[in-house]
From Swiss-Prot:
Name of the protein this chain belongs to: Protein translocase subunit SecF
Annotated membrane topology: Multi-pass membrane protein
Species this chain originates from: Sebaldella termitidis (strain ATCC 33386 / NCTC 11300)
GO cellular component: plasma membrane
Domain of life of the source: Bacteria
Location relative to the cell: Cell inner membrane
Entry-linked InterPro entries: SecD/SecF_arch_bac (IPR022813), SecD/SecF_bac (IPR022645), SecD/SecF_CS (IPR022646), SecD_SecF_C (IPR048634), SecD_SecF_C_bact (IPR055344), SecF_bac (IPR005665)
Gene Ontology biological-process annotations: intracellular protein transmembrane transport; protein targeting; protein transport by the Sec complex
UniProt key word tRNA-binding: no
Bilayer-crossing regions: 12-32, 127-147, 152-172, 182-202, 234-254, 262-282
A single MF term (Gene Ontology): protein-transporting ATPase activity
Similarity field: Belongs to the SecD/SecF family. SecF subfamily.
Summary of subunit composition and partner proteins: Forms a complex with SecD. Part of the essential Sec protein translocation apparatus which comprises SecA, SecYEG and auxiliary proteins SecDF. Other proteins may also be involved.
Keywords: Cell inner membrane, Cell membrane, Membrane, Protein transport, Translocation, Transmembrane, Transmembrane helix, Transport
Length: 308
């Protein structure tokens, strides 16, 4: 590969800025399609006399959703002994009775083991914990990369990670995919995946920078470093995306948002690791203190001045 990354870096900055603004616009205007985990709802546990077909139950619930608003967002869990656990949005007593009667007519007789209202406490608590995890993770990343590399690498990596998270969340908001607890897990997974790619590239940049000792322009050092790891990064991401695509196709509706979130996040994570984080390092390098003068009067060229 012979990518001229630094020559077109402004294009990537403009694209990323546009995507961030678009994501913020979607989040503040369209909001999120919150699932039962965050809004609360009703839970029905039923033990059917005969085995229940997942396909038949899904079809029945889809048809019933046009009549009963609480079924527009639902989750079904199947367990041994013909037991089905159905979670829906909040419904009044009249709607609950109608749903239970129609299920009996469509799927056969059952024993109603439990019918309760559930709150959104768990989902809200998880969302709060996820925000704390994101904040703490960003701080730890800053500390770790500052120690292992230097502050310009640390700041660049955190900015790239926040970009990945924001754009992914904006995508979910724009297309109004249901936000549930697995969505939070997907966001945290994206952080780890993107960080791994970024560190691999940064390590190669640092290695080459030390090797040339300032004799080669830093922009060329970045281009050379990215070209050496480009194929590895892309192939790793493609392998993961193929596995996620299979899960999206065959995994059913329960994991739909989780899989879509990971797909989008990994695509943007790969993009940001290569086309955003590295140019950010180049941009931030000009804020470093100028190199000290050596005793013999010669200037230390270990750090080349970067002109943007």
């Amino acid at each position: 590969m012979d990518l001229k990354l630094m020559k077109t870096r402004n294009v990537y900055f403009i694209f990323s800025t546009f995507m961030i603004l678009f994501s913020l616009f979607s989040i503040f205007t369209k909001g999120f399609n919150l699932g039962i985990d965050f809004t609360g709802g009703n839970i029905y546990q039923m033990k059917f006399e005969k085995p229940v077909s997942k396909e038949a139950m899904d079809k029945t619930l889809k048809e019933m959703a046009s009549k009963y608003p609480s079924l527009k967002s639902n989750k079904v869990q199947y367990s041994e002994g013909n037991t089905v656990l159905l979670r829906t949005q909040i419904a009044d007593e009249k709607e609950k009775s109608a749903i239970l009667e129609e299920l009996k007519a469509e799927q056969g007789n059952y024993e109603l083991i439990k019918a309760d209202a559930v709150g959104a406490v768990v989902g809200n608590e998880l969302a709060k914990n996820a925000l704390w995890a994101l904040a703490l993770g960003s701080i730890l990343i800053l500390i770790y990369i500052t120690i292992r590399f230097e502050w310009i690498y640390a700041l660049s990596s955190v900015l790239a990670l926040l970009h990945d998270v924001l754009v992914t969340i904006g995508f979910i908001s724009f297309f109004q995919f249901e936000v549930d607890t697995p969505f939070i897990a997907a966001i945290l997974t994206i952080l780890g995946y993107s960080m791994n790619d970024t560190i691999v590239i940064f390590d190669r940049i640092r290695e080459n920078d030390h090797k040339y000792g300032g004799k080669k322009p830093f922009a060329d050092v970045i281009d050379e470093s990215v070209n050496k790891v480009f194929i590895r990064s892309v192939y790793t991401s493609l392998t993961t995306l193929l596995a996620l695509a299979a899960l999206l196709i065959f995994g059913g509706s329960t994991l739909r948002t989780f899989n879509i979130t990971l797909l989008v996040g990994i695509v943007y994570g790969t993009y940001s690791s290569i086309w955003l984080a590295s140019p950010l390092v180049y941009l931030l390098r000009r804020f470093k203190k100028p190199p000290k003068q050596e005793k013999n009067g010669k200037k230390d060229r270990s750090m080349e001045k970067v002109v943007v």
